């Protein structure tokens, strides 16, 4: 496809993990925007000084901590300025496999009626078995609360941050109405 694909990665307290994530982002991704949200571990500098720093990587350093939603919105705005076609958001903690980007981008490319696609961390049973108990049960609770408040019962992992969005629909969103913090995922 000729669709320009960009990836936005908000980082805070990620550290060296970012190198593995950046190294595994597939070659068909045109641009990568890493948003260092005043990370005390210096994740932006770690990425900047690593072999993963290629010409497709742009590192943006926020002057103050904006929260995960605020950091993603900074990345989204940059992608819109650069005429990205589809924008993928993936967390910097390497919780999601960047090799799965194709699975959330392809439905948007192949179906002109589809503008947004959300990943599911719990699709594979092996992933659930390896998930820390506190995070697993916390996600169950947050997912239930999100479904209860939104009415979207068919979304299996509503607080998951692995998403793809068509830039044409992203341009229509009012970023002021989208949370700058953790509720960003639910607002989207």
Task: Please give the residue ranges for each predicted region.
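Cell-envelope/extracellular polymer assembly enzymes that use nucleotide-activated donors
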Residues: 4-6, 31, 187
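Short hydrophobic beta-strand elements that form part
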Residues: 6-9, 33, 61
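Short, well-formed alpha-helical segments that are part of the catalytic scaffolds
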Residues: 12-27
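Donor nucleotide-sugar binding loop of glycosyltransferases
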Residues: 14-17, 39, 97
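A conserved acidic beta->alpha catalytic loop
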Residues: 36-45
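Acceptor/aglycone-binding surface of glycosyltransferases and processive sugar-polymer synthases
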Residues: 62-64, 68-81, 98-182
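Short beta-strand-to-loop acidic/aromatic patch adjacent to the donor-nucleotide binding site
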Residues: 84-95
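Acidic donor-binding loop at a coil-to-helix junction in glycosyltransferase catalytic cores
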Residues: 182-188
């Amino acid at each position: 496809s000729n669709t320009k694909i960009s990836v936005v990665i908000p980082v805070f307290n990620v550290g060296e993990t970012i190198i593995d994530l950046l190294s595994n982002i597939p070659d068909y991704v045109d641009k990568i925007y890493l948003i260092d949200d005043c990370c005390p571990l210096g994740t932006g500098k770690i990425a900047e000084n690593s072999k993963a720093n290629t010409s497709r990587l742009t590192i943006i350093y926020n002057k103050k901590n904006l929260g995960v939603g605020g950091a993603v919105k900074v990345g989204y705005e940059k992608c819109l300025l650069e005429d990205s076609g589809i924008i993928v958001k993936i967390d910097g903690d390497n919780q999601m496999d960047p090799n799965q980007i194709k699975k959330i981008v392809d439905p948007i490319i192949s179906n002109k009626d589809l503008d947004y696609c959300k990943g599911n961390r719990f699709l594979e049973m092996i992933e659930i078995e390896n998930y820390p108990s506190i995070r697993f049960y916390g996600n169950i609770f947050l997912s239930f609360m999100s479904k209860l408040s939104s009415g979207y019962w068919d979304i299996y992992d509503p607080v998951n941050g692995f998403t793809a969005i068509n830039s044409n629909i992203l341009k229509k969103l009012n970023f002021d109405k989208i949370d700058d913090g953790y509720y960003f995922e639910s607002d989207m």
